[in-house]
Amino acid sequence: MTQDYETVLKGKYPAKEHALRVADYVKSKVPDATGILYVEGRMTKMLEDNDEPEPFRQRRYFYYLTGCPLADCHYIFDLATSKSTLFIPPIDPDSVIWSGLPVSAAEAKELYDVDEVKYTTDVNAELARLGKGPKKTVFAIQNQVLDSITFLEFDEKNFSILKDAIERCRVVKDDYEIALTRKANAVSTVAHHAVVEYVKKAKNERELEALFLQRSVANGAKNQAYHGIFAGGRAAATLHYVANDAPLEGKLNLLLDAGTEWNCYASDITRTFPISGKFSKESRQIYDIVLKMQLETTAALKEGVIWDEIHLLAHKIAIDGLHLIGILKGDKDEILKNRTSVAFFPHGLGHYLGMDTHDVGGNANYADRDPMFRYLRVRGALPAGSIVTVEPGIYFCSFIIEPYLKDPVHSKFIDSAVLEKYWDVGGVRIEDNILITKDGSENLTPTIKDPDELEKIIQAS
Protein backbone atom coordinates (compact mmCIF):
# COMPACT_ATOMS: atom_id res chain seq x y z
CA MET A 1 0.00 0.00 0.00
CA THR A 2 1.26 3.45 -0.88
CA GLN A 3 2.06 5.27 2.33
CA ASP A 4 1.49 8.93 3.06
CA TYR A 5 5.12 9.92 2.68
CA GLU A 6 4.65 13.32 4.29
CA THR A 7 3.43 11.64 7.49
CA VAL A 8 6.35 9.22 7.47
CA LEU A 9 8.81 12.08 7.02
CA LYS A 10 7.59 13.82 10.17
CA GLY A 11 9.55 11.23 12.12
CA LYS A 12 13.30 10.91 12.50
CA TYR A 13 15.52 9.34 9.88
CA PRO A 14 16.00 5.75 11.24
CA ALA A 15 19.75 5.94 11.69
CA LYS A 16 19.91 3.62 14.71
CA GLU A 17 18.09 0.88 12.81
CA HIS A 18 20.61 1.30 9.99
CA ALA A 19 23.51 1.08 12.43
CA LEU A 20 22.16 -2.12 13.94
CA ARG A 21 21.80 -3.69 10.49
CA VAL A 22 25.36 -2.71 9.59
CA ALA A 23 26.66 -4.04 12.91
CA ASP A 24 24.90 -7.37 12.30
CA TYR A 25 26.55 -7.63 8.90
CA VAL A 26 29.99 -6.90 10.37
CA LYS A 27 29.44 -9.54 13.05
CA SER A 28 28.37 -12.05 10.40
CA LYS A 29 31.76 -11.59 8.74
CA VAL A 30 33.76 -11.30 11.97
CA PRO A 31 31.81 -13.44 14.47
CA ASP A 32 33.96 -12.55 17.47
CA ALA A 33 34.07 -8.83 16.63
CA THR A 34 34.42 -6.48 19.56
CA GLY A 35 35.11 -2.78 19.43
CA ILE A 36 33.49 -0.01 17.43
CA LEU A 37 32.31 1.22 14.07
CA TYR A 38 33.78 4.62 13.24
CA VAL A 39 32.80 6.96 10.41
CA GLU A 40 33.37 10.60 9.59
CA GLY A 41 31.17 13.06 7.78
CA ARG A 42 32.50 15.33 5.07
CA MET A 43 34.83 18.01 6.32
CA THR A 44 34.63 21.63 5.29
CA LYS A 45 36.97 22.24 2.37
CA MET A 46 37.86 25.64 1.00
CA LEU A 47 38.00 26.52 -2.66
CA GLU A 48 41.55 26.74 -3.94
CA ASP A 49 42.99 30.28 -3.60
CA ASN A 50 39.71 31.46 -2.09
CA ASP A 51 38.13 32.07 1.31
CA GLU A 52 34.83 30.44 0.32
CA PRO A 53 33.99 26.79 1.09
CA GLU A 54 33.33 24.28 -1.65
CA PRO A 55 29.68 23.29 -2.07
CA PHE A 56 28.96 20.79 0.68
CA ARG A 57 27.66 17.27 0.04
CA GLN A 58 27.41 15.01 3.06
CA ARG A 59 29.30 11.75 2.96
CA ARG A 60 26.69 9.06 2.32
CA TYR A 61 28.22 6.40 4.58
CA PHE A 62 28.05 8.84 7.48
CA TYR A 63 24.52 10.01 6.69
CA TYR A 64 23.22 6.44 6.55
CA LEU A 65 24.29 5.88 10.16
CA THR A 66 23.34 9.31 11.55
CA GLY A 67 20.85 11.20 9.39
CA CYS A 68 23.01 14.24 10.18
CA PRO A 69 23.66 16.76 7.38
CA LEU A 70 26.22 18.84 9.32
CA ALA A 71 29.84 19.25 8.25
CA ASP A 72 32.89 18.25 10.29
CA CYS A 73 31.23 15.50 12.35
CA HIS A 74 32.23 12.05 13.63
CA TYR A 75 30.30 8.95 14.71
CA ILE A 76 31.00 5.94 16.90
CA PHE A 77 28.90 2.80 17.34
CA ASP A 78 29.89 0.53 20.24
CA LEU A 79 29.46 -3.11 19.16
CA ALA A 80 29.25 -4.31 22.78
CA THR A 81 26.49 -1.97 23.95
CA SER A 82 24.92 -0.89 20.62
CA LYS A 83 25.32 2.70 21.78
CA SER A 84 25.65 5.32 19.06
CA THR A 85 27.44 8.62 19.62
CA LEU A 86 27.48 11.60 17.28
CA PHE A 87 30.23 14.20 17.60
CA ILE A 88 29.45 17.68 16.26
CA PRO A 89 31.64 20.81 16.10
CA PRO A 90 31.60 22.98 19.22
CA ILE A 91 30.56 26.61 19.12
CA ASP A 92 33.26 28.87 17.72
CA PRO A 93 32.55 32.34 19.15
CA ASP A 94 34.45 34.02 16.31
CA SER A 95 32.18 32.47 13.68
CA VAL A 96 28.84 33.17 15.33
CA ILE A 97 28.70 36.76 14.10
CA TRP A 98 29.18 35.53 10.52
CA SER A 99 27.23 32.31 10.49
CA GLY A 100 24.91 32.39 13.49
CA LEU A 101 24.71 29.86 16.28
CA PRO A 102 25.36 26.27 15.20
CA VAL A 103 23.30 23.29 16.28
CA SER A 104 23.97 22.49 19.94
CA ALA A 105 24.47 19.00 21.35
CA ALA A 106 21.04 19.11 22.98
CA GLU A 107 19.40 20.18 19.73
CA ALA A 108 21.24 17.50 17.76
CA LYS A 109 20.03 14.84 20.21
CA GLU A 110 16.45 15.86 19.38
CA LEU A 111 17.06 16.04 15.63
CA TYR A 112 18.99 12.84 14.96
CA ASP A 113 18.42 9.19 15.85
CA VAL A 114 21.50 8.66 18.02
CA ASP A 115 21.92 7.77 21.68
CA GLU A 116 24.31 10.55 22.66
CA VAL A 117 25.75 13.73 21.18
CA LYS A 118 29.13 15.12 22.15
CA TYR A 119 31.49 17.68 20.67
CA THR A 120 34.34 16.83 18.33
CA THR A 121 36.86 17.96 20.94
CA ASP A 122 36.01 14.72 22.78
CA VAL A 123 36.53 12.27 19.90
CA ASN A 124 40.07 11.09 20.63
CA ALA A 125 39.43 10.75 24.36
CA GLU A 126 36.36 8.63 23.64
CA LEU A 127 38.33 6.50 21.18
CA ALA A 128 41.03 5.94 23.79
CA ARG A 129 38.44 4.87 26.37
CA LEU A 130 36.65 2.47 24.01
CA GLY A 131 39.91 0.98 22.74
CA LYS A 132 41.02 -0.28 26.14
CA GLY A 133 40.58 -3.98 26.74
CA PRO A 134 41.58 -7.17 24.97
CA LYS A 135 41.15 -7.66 21.23
CA LYS A 136 39.28 -4.44 20.51
CA THR A 137 38.90 -3.63 16.80
CA VAL A 138 38.02 -0.34 15.18
CA PHE A 139 36.12 -0.79 11.93
CA ALA A 140 36.54 2.27 9.71
CA ILE A 141 36.62 3.17 6.02
CA GLN A 142 39.91 3.41 4.15
CA ASN A 143 40.96 6.99 3.28
CA GLN A 144 38.06 8.45 5.28
CA VAL A 145 39.83 9.07 8.58
CA LEU A 146 41.48 12.37 9.48
CA ASP A 147 45.17 12.40 10.33
CA SER A 148 44.30 13.91 13.70
CA ILE A 149 42.26 10.86 14.71
CA THR A 150 44.14 8.25 16.74
CA PHE A 151 43.27 4.58 17.12
CA LEU A 152 46.28 3.86 19.34
CA GLU A 153 44.41 1.87 22.01
CA PHE A 154 42.85 -0.59 19.57
CA ASP A 155 44.56 -3.93 19.00
CA GLU A 156 43.26 -4.18 15.46
CA LYS A 157 42.20 -1.76 12.76
CA ASN A 158 39.92 -3.07 10.02
CA PHE A 159 39.49 -0.84 6.98
CA SER A 160 37.90 -3.40 4.65
CA ILE A 161 34.54 -4.56 6.01
CA LEU A 162 32.60 -1.45 7.07
CA LYS A 163 32.27 0.14 3.64
CA ASP A 164 30.98 -3.09 2.14
CA ALA A 165 28.60 -3.59 5.07
CA ILE A 166 27.01 -0.17 4.62
CA GLU A 167 26.75 -0.59 0.86
CA ARG A 168 25.01 -3.95 1.17
CA CYS A 169 22.56 -2.60 3.74
CA ARG A 170 21.79 0.45 1.59
CA VAL A 171 20.41 -1.71 -1.23
CA VAL A 172 17.19 -2.54 0.66
CA LYS A 173 15.27 0.56 1.67
CA ASP A 174 13.06 0.99 4.72
CA ASP A 175 9.78 2.91 4.76
CA TYR A 176 11.49 6.19 5.61
CA GLU A 177 13.95 5.92 2.74
CA ILE A 178 11.12 5.05 0.36
CA ALA A 179 9.21 8.11 1.60
CA LEU A 180 12.24 10.31 0.89
CA THR A 181 12.39 8.92 -2.64
CA ARG A 182 8.66 9.56 -3.12
CA LYS A 183 9.15 13.15 -1.97
CA ALA A 184 12.08 13.69 -4.32
CA ASN A 185 9.99 12.30 -7.18
CA ALA A 186 7.05 14.53 -6.30
CA VAL A 187 9.14 17.70 -6.38
CA SER A 188 10.93 16.61 -9.55
CA THR A 189 7.58 15.99 -11.22
CA VAL A 190 6.49 19.57 -10.56
CA ALA A 191 9.70 20.79 -12.21
CA HIS A 192 9.40 18.36 -15.13
CA HIS A 193 5.84 19.44 -15.85
CA ALA A 194 6.87 23.10 -15.74
CA VAL A 195 9.45 22.42 -18.47
CA VAL A 196 6.89 20.56 -20.61
CA GLU A 197 4.50 23.51 -20.33
CA TYR A 198 7.19 26.03 -21.31
CA VAL A 199 9.22 24.15 -23.92
CA LYS A 200 7.39 25.56 -26.94
CA LYS A 201 8.25 29.12 -25.84
CA ALA A 202 11.91 28.47 -25.03
CA LYS A 203 14.68 29.57 -27.37
CA ASN A 204 17.60 27.82 -25.68
CA GLU A 205 18.20 24.73 -23.54
CA ARG A 206 19.51 26.88 -20.70
CA GLU A 207 16.09 28.48 -20.20
CA LEU A 208 14.64 25.06 -19.48
CA GLU A 209 17.43 24.13 -17.10
CA ALA A 210 16.90 27.42 -15.25
CA LEU A 211 13.18 26.75 -14.99
CA PHE A 212 13.74 23.25 -13.63
CA LEU A 213 16.14 24.54 -11.00
CA GLN A 214 13.78 27.36 -10.03
CA ARG A 215 10.83 25.03 -9.50
CA SER A 216 12.98 22.59 -7.55
CA VAL A 217 14.30 25.20 -5.13
CA ALA A 218 10.92 26.91 -4.82
CA ASN A 219 9.47 23.60 -3.66
CA GLY A 220 12.18 22.97 -1.08
CA ALA A 221 14.72 20.90 -3.00
CA LYS A 222 17.88 23.02 -3.02
CA ASN A 223 20.10 20.25 -4.37
CA GLN A 224 19.92 18.33 -7.60
CA ALA A 225 20.68 14.62 -7.49
CA TYR A 226 22.93 15.03 -10.54
CA HIS A 227 23.70 17.47 -13.32
CA GLY A 228 20.53 17.58 -15.38
CA ILE A 229 20.37 16.84 -19.11
CA PHE A 230 18.38 19.25 -21.28
CA ALA A 231 19.19 17.95 -24.74
CA GLY A 232 17.50 19.35 -27.82
CA GLY A 233 17.46 17.51 -31.15
CA ARG A 234 20.47 15.39 -32.00
CA ALA A 235 22.15 16.24 -28.70
CA ALA A 236 19.81 13.67 -27.12
CA ALA A 237 21.99 10.97 -28.69
CA THR A 238 24.71 11.90 -26.17
CA LEU A 239 23.79 9.90 -23.08
CA HIS A 240 25.17 12.33 -20.49
CA TYR A 241 24.93 15.59 -22.42
CA VAL A 242 25.46 18.44 -19.95
CA ALA A 243 26.17 21.56 -22.03
CA ASN A 244 22.50 22.62 -21.86
CA ASP A 245 23.31 25.75 -23.84
CA ALA A 246 22.21 25.19 -27.43
CA PRO A 247 19.41 26.91 -29.37
CA LEU A 248 16.21 24.91 -29.83
CA GLU A 249 15.03 26.35 -33.13
CA GLY A 250 14.47 23.72 -35.81
CA LYS A 251 14.88 20.77 -33.44
CA LEU A 252 12.32 18.03 -33.02
CA ASN A 253 12.47 16.85 -29.43
CA LEU A 254 13.80 17.62 -25.98
CA LEU A 255 15.24 14.86 -23.84
CA LEU A 256 14.95 15.96 -20.20
CA ASP A 257 16.83 13.84 -17.66
CA ALA A 258 16.81 15.58 -14.29
CA GLY A 259 15.95 14.86 -10.68
CA THR A 260 16.01 16.64 -7.37
CA GLU A 261 17.45 15.37 -4.13
CA TRP A 262 15.47 15.37 -0.89
CA ASN A 263 17.48 15.06 2.33
CA CYS A 264 20.27 13.18 0.58
CA TYR A 265 17.94 10.86 -1.39
CA ALA A 266 17.81 11.05 -5.17
CA SER A 267 15.20 10.95 -7.87
CA ASP A 268 16.19 10.20 -11.46
CA ILE A 269 13.56 10.88 -14.11
CA THR A 270 13.76 11.13 -17.90
CA ARG A 271 11.13 12.27 -20.34
CA THR A 272 11.31 12.99 -24.08
CA PHE A 273 8.75 15.20 -25.80
CA PRO A 274 8.22 17.25 -28.98
CA ILE A 275 9.32 20.87 -28.76
CA SER A 276 6.58 21.93 -31.19
CA GLY A 277 3.86 19.99 -29.41
CA LYS A 278 3.57 17.33 -32.11
CA PHE A 279 5.81 14.31 -32.54
CA SER A 280 7.13 13.78 -36.04
CA LYS A 281 6.21 10.40 -37.55
CA GLU A 282 9.69 9.02 -36.91
CA SER A 283 9.88 10.44 -33.39
CA ARG A 284 6.53 8.91 -32.43
CA GLN A 285 7.58 5.53 -33.81
CA ILE A 286 10.71 5.53 -31.67
CA TYR A 287 8.84 6.89 -28.64
CA ASP A 288 6.29 4.09 -28.85
CA ILE A 289 9.02 1.46 -29.03
CA VAL A 290 10.81 2.88 -25.99
CA LEU A 291 7.57 3.20 -24.04
CA LYS A 292 6.78 -0.44 -24.78
CA MET A 293 10.27 -1.40 -23.63
CA GLN A 294 9.71 0.44 -20.38
CA LEU A 295 6.18 -0.76 -19.65
CA GLU A 296 6.89 -4.42 -20.40
CA THR A 297 10.16 -4.60 -18.50
CA THR A 298 8.58 -2.87 -15.50
CA ALA A 299 5.67 -5.32 -15.59
CA ALA A 300 8.17 -8.19 -15.32
CA LEU A 301 9.76 -6.91 -12.11
CA LYS A 302 9.37 -8.52 -8.70
CA GLU A 303 11.52 -9.85 -5.89
CA GLY A 304 14.14 -12.28 -7.11
CA VAL A 305 14.05 -11.53 -10.83
CA ILE A 306 17.43 -11.44 -12.53
CA TRP A 307 18.13 -7.92 -13.77
CA ASP A 308 20.28 -9.26 -16.61
CA GLU A 309 17.20 -11.06 -17.97
CA ILE A 310 15.06 -7.92 -17.76
CA HIS A 311 17.74 -6.04 -19.68
CA LEU A 312 17.74 -8.78 -22.30
CA LEU A 313 13.94 -8.47 -22.57
CA ALA A 314 14.35 -4.75 -23.29
CA HIS A 315 16.69 -5.54 -26.18
CA LYS A 316 14.26 -8.10 -27.61
CA ILE A 317 11.46 -5.52 -27.59
CA ALA A 318 13.77 -2.94 -29.18
CA ILE A 319 14.70 -5.39 -31.93
CA ASP A 320 11.04 -6.18 -32.60
CA GLY A 321 10.19 -2.47 -32.84
CA LEU A 322 13.15 -1.43 -34.97
CA HIS A 323 12.56 -4.41 -37.24
CA LEU A 324 8.90 -3.47 -37.68
CA ILE A 325 9.74 0.06 -38.88
CA GLY A 326 12.55 -1.18 -41.12
CA ILE A 327 15.70 0.10 -39.42
CA LEU A 328 16.70 -3.47 -38.63
CA LYS A 329 16.26 -6.29 -41.11
CA GLY A 330 16.96 -9.98 -41.36
CA ASP A 331 16.56 -12.70 -38.76
CA LYS A 332 15.74 -11.22 -35.35
CA ASP A 333 17.40 -14.05 -33.44
CA GLU A 334 20.61 -13.43 -35.38
CA ILE A 335 20.36 -9.69 -34.67
CA LEU A 336 20.15 -10.48 -30.96
CA LYS A 337 22.92 -13.07 -31.12
CA ASN A 338 25.28 -10.63 -32.86
CA ARG A 339 24.36 -7.79 -30.46
CA THR A 340 23.53 -5.39 -33.31
CA SER A 341 20.83 -3.73 -31.20
CA VAL A 342 23.57 -2.38 -28.92
CA ALA A 343 24.22 0.21 -31.64
CA PHE A 344 20.88 1.79 -30.78
CA PHE A 345 20.56 0.85 -27.08
CA PRO A 346 24.15 1.00 -25.80
CA HIS A 347 23.61 1.43 -22.05
CA GLY A 348 22.18 -0.63 -19.21
CA LEU A 349 18.45 -0.70 -18.51
CA GLY A 350 18.91 1.02 -15.17
CA HIS A 351 20.63 1.12 -11.80
CA TYR A 352 19.96 1.12 -8.08
CA LEU A 353 18.72 4.44 -6.72
CA GLY A 354 19.12 5.77 -3.20
CA MET A 355 21.38 8.35 -1.61
CA ASP A 356 23.40 8.28 -4.80
CA THR A 357 21.84 8.47 -8.24
CA HIS A 358 23.94 5.52 -9.36
CA ASP A 359 23.61 3.87 -5.98
CA VAL A 360 25.84 1.26 -4.42
CA GLY A 361 25.45 -2.52 -4.39
CA GLY A 362 24.89 -3.23 -8.07
CA ASN A 363 27.86 -5.57 -8.64
CA ALA A 364 28.54 -4.17 -12.11
CA ASN A 365 31.06 -5.94 -14.33
CA TYR A 366 32.49 -3.37 -16.73
CA ALA A 367 35.02 -5.93 -17.94
CA ASP A 368 32.26 -8.13 -19.36
CA ARG A 369 33.17 -9.05 -22.93
CA ASP A 370 29.51 -9.13 -23.94
CA PRO A 371 28.72 -5.58 -25.12
CA MET A 372 25.05 -6.05 -24.29
CA PHE A 373 25.80 -6.41 -20.58
CA ARG A 374 29.07 -4.49 -20.17
CA TYR A 375 27.45 -1.28 -18.96
CA LEU A 376 24.75 -2.90 -16.86
CA ARG A 377 25.10 -1.27 -13.43
CA VAL A 378 23.11 -3.98 -11.64
CA ARG A 379 23.80 -7.71 -12.04
CA GLY A 380 21.89 -10.55 -10.43
CA ALA A 381 18.65 -10.87 -8.46
CA LEU A 382 16.68 -7.86 -7.22
CA PRO A 383 15.66 -7.94 -3.54
CA ALA A 384 12.33 -6.63 -2.31
CA GLY A 385 12.78 -3.11 -0.96
CA SER A 386 15.36 -2.12 -3.54
CA ILE A 387 14.68 0.79 -5.88
CA VAL A 388 15.82 0.63 -9.49
CA THR A 389 15.52 2.98 -12.41
CA VAL A 390 13.97 1.55 -15.56
CA GLU A 391 15.29 3.72 -18.37
CA PRO A 392 15.33 2.12 -21.80
CA GLY A 393 16.34 4.27 -24.74
CA ILE A 394 16.93 4.24 -28.46
CA TYR A 395 19.53 6.64 -29.85
CA PHE A 396 20.84 7.72 -33.22
CA CYS A 397 24.45 8.60 -32.46
CA SER A 398 26.56 8.58 -35.62
CA PHE A 399 29.79 8.02 -33.69
CA ILE A 400 28.40 4.77 -32.27
CA ILE A 401 26.34 3.57 -35.24
CA GLU A 402 28.75 4.24 -38.12
CA PRO A 403 31.24 1.52 -37.08
CA TYR A 404 28.34 -0.94 -37.13
CA LEU A 405 27.48 0.19 -40.66
CA LYS A 406 31.07 -0.53 -41.73
CA ASP A 407 31.18 -3.94 -40.05
CA PRO A 408 29.86 -6.75 -42.30
CA VAL A 409 28.70 -8.69 -39.24
CA HIS A 410 26.27 -5.89 -38.35
CA SER A 411 25.69 -3.93 -41.55
CA LYS A 412 23.63 -6.70 -43.12
CA PHE A 413 21.07 -6.21 -40.32
CA ILE A 414 20.77 -2.39 -40.67
CA ASP A 415 18.92 -0.65 -43.51
CA SER A 416 20.96 2.53 -43.88
CA ALA A 417 18.40 4.09 -46.25
CA VAL A 418 15.65 3.77 -43.65
CA LEU A 419 18.03 4.83 -40.88
CA GLU A 420 18.71 8.10 -42.70
CA LYS A 421 15.22 9.34 -41.81
CA TYR A 422 15.83 9.00 -38.06
CA TRP A 423 19.01 10.96 -37.30
CA ASP A 424 17.09 14.10 -36.30
CA VAL A 425 15.12 12.14 -33.71
CA GLY A 426 18.35 12.22 -31.71
CA GLY A 427 17.41 9.91 -28.90
CA VAL A 428 14.42 8.88 -26.82
CA ARG A 429 14.71 7.75 -23.21
CA ILE A 430 11.93 7.24 -20.66
CA GLU A 431 12.92 6.68 -17.03
CA ASP A 432 10.97 5.97 -13.86
CA ASN A 433 11.99 4.99 -10.32
CA ILE A 434 10.62 1.56 -9.40
CA LEU A 435 10.28 -0.01 -5.94
CA ILE A 436 10.68 -3.79 -6.02
CA THR A 437 8.09 -5.67 -3.94
CA LYS A 438 7.56 -9.34 -3.09
CA ASP A 439 4.96 -9.89 -5.80
CA GLY A 440 5.71 -7.10 -8.27
CA SER A 441 6.75 -3.48 -8.19
CA GLU A 442 5.49 0.04 -7.58
CA ASN A 443 6.26 3.04 -9.76
CA LEU A 444 7.30 5.97 -7.55
CA THR A 445 7.38 8.42 -10.47
CA PRO A 446 4.10 10.23 -11.27
CA THR A 447 5.56 12.32 -14.11
CA ILE A 448 3.47 12.32 -17.30
CA LYS A 449 4.77 10.09 -20.09
CA ASP A 450 1.69 9.36 -22.20
CA PRO A 451 2.66 10.76 -25.62
CA ASP A 452 -0.82 12.06 -26.45
CA GLU A 453 -1.05 13.81 -23.09
CA LEU A 454 2.38 15.38 -23.55
CA GLU A 455 1.34 16.73 -26.94
CA LYS A 456 -1.87 18.19 -25.50
CA ILE A 457 -0.05 20.00 -22.70
CA ILE A 458 2.57 21.49 -25.03
CA GLN A 459 0.01 22.52 -27.64
CA ALA A 460 -2.12 24.23 -24.97
CA SER A 461 0.80 26.14 -23.47
Swiss-Prot record:
For whether the record's keyword set contains Iron, the answer is: no
Indicate whether Hydrolase appears among the record's keywords: yes
Q: What is its EC number?
A: 3.4.11.9
Q: Which family does it belong to?
A: Belongs to the peptidase M24B family.
Which GO molecular function annotation, any one, does this entry have?
metalloaminopeptidase activity
- Encoding gene (name): PEPP
List positions binding Mn(2+) 2: D257, D268, E431
List the source organism.
Colletotrichum graminicola (strain M1.001 / M2 / FGSC 10212) (Maize anthracnose fungus)
A Pfam family hit: Peptidase_M24
What are the record keywords, sorted? Aminopeptidase, Hydrolase, Manganese, Metal-binding, Metalloprotease, Protease
The record's comment on cofactor binding reads:
Binds 2 manganese ions per subunit.
Q: Any idea what this protein is called?
A: Probable Xaa-Pro aminopeptidase PEPP
